[in-house]
Amino acid sequence: MKKLVVLGGGESGVGTAILGKQKGFRVFVSDKGNIVEKYKKVLLNNEIEFEENQHTENTILDADLVMKSPGIPEKVAIIQLLKNKSIPVISEIEFAAYYTDATIIGITGSNGKTTTTLLVHHILKKANLSIGVAGNIGDSFAQQVAEKSYENYVLELSSFQLDGIDKFNSNIAILTNITPDHLDRYDYDFNTYV
């Protein structure tokens, strides 16, 4: 059985853990901070092993695959250790996309993502399409793939969520705009952000 380590015990992490367990992975969730009580309950109810307030390196470096929550920068030590060991580190969006054949509309940009995502979702729902909304809003994409069977998804995708994308491609992509936001995460280089 392959081991999936999930770094981050929030919305993206817990959703990925649920989907990973459903797909036959041995799942371990690690969060450097506290895991919110509602997420702890979900992990306990699904019998998913977890730790909080630390990252146990030996346990994490034993992974076959790692999902990094969007709030964790690429530069942190544990991510660098994983990359040095050639352990794949992907995003929740990438992981969830492996397990759905749904049509995906991806919406990104510096401003207007949420409004555009909700508008597109509303229009398509009114057109009676089987449509879920996820990404940076609502339930995680991974959790929805695990628990629901939508034929289409509208995903709000922040730049942080797009870090760790390898093969993910939405069927339709919308870029609202690009302005110099979050440059601290991208070494203050606008081209890296873009």
Task: Give the residues covered by each predicted segment.
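N-terminal leader/targeting and accessory segments in enzymes
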Residues: 1-91, 95
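Phosphate-binding loop of NTP-binding sites
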Residues: 21-22, 58-61, 70-194
